[in-house]
UniProtKB/Swiss-Prot annotation:
Its EC number is 2.7.7.6. One of its GO terms (cellular component) is cytoplasm. This is DNA-directed RNA polymerase subunit Rpo5. One of its GO terms (molecular function) is DNA-directed RNA polymerase activity. The keyword Cell inner membrane does not apply. InterPro entries: Arch_Rpo5/euc_Rpb5 (IPR014381), RNA_pol_subH/Rpb5_C (IPR000783), RNA_pol_subH/Rpb5_CS (IPR020608), RPB5-like_sf (IPR035913). Pfam families: RNA_pol_Rpb5_C (PF01191). HAMAP family: RNApol_Rpo5_RPB5. Its main location: cytoplasm. Keywords: Cytoplasm, DNA-directed RNA polymerase, Nucleotidyltransferase, Transcription, Transferase. It catalyses: RNA(n) + a ribonucleoside 5'-triphosphate = RNA(n+1) + diphosphate. It comes from Methanothrix thermoacetophila (strain DSM 6194 / JCM 14653 / NBRC 101360 / PT). Part of the RNA polymerase complex.
């Protein structure tokens, strides 16, 4: 049986696991601590698919009718 890839679904926005360096750069750019970011659970299907671990930061790119693309960041929690 073929395994279903969550990210291949048209309604799921692109999720990118940031490296520690990229994550630190994002936090410095916005002047926030990781704990202040919106959260995503480590058990979320996309988080599991991309191999995210607790404490990682995920960049989410969503298509937007007005801005063409919106970028969000999520902290992976337990």
């Amino acid at each position: 049986m073929k395994r279903f890839a969550v990210q291949d679904h048209e309604l799921v926005p692109e999720h990118i696991l940031l490296t520690p360096e990229e994550a630190q750069q994002v936090l410095m750019q916005y002047g926030v601590e990781a704990r202040h970011l919106p959260k995503i659970h480590v058990t979320d299907p996309v988080a599991k698919e991309i191999g995210a671990k607790v404490g990682d930061i995920i960049k989410i790119k969503r298509k937007s009718p007005t801005a063409k693309e919106s970028i969000f960041y999520r902290l992976v929690i337990d």
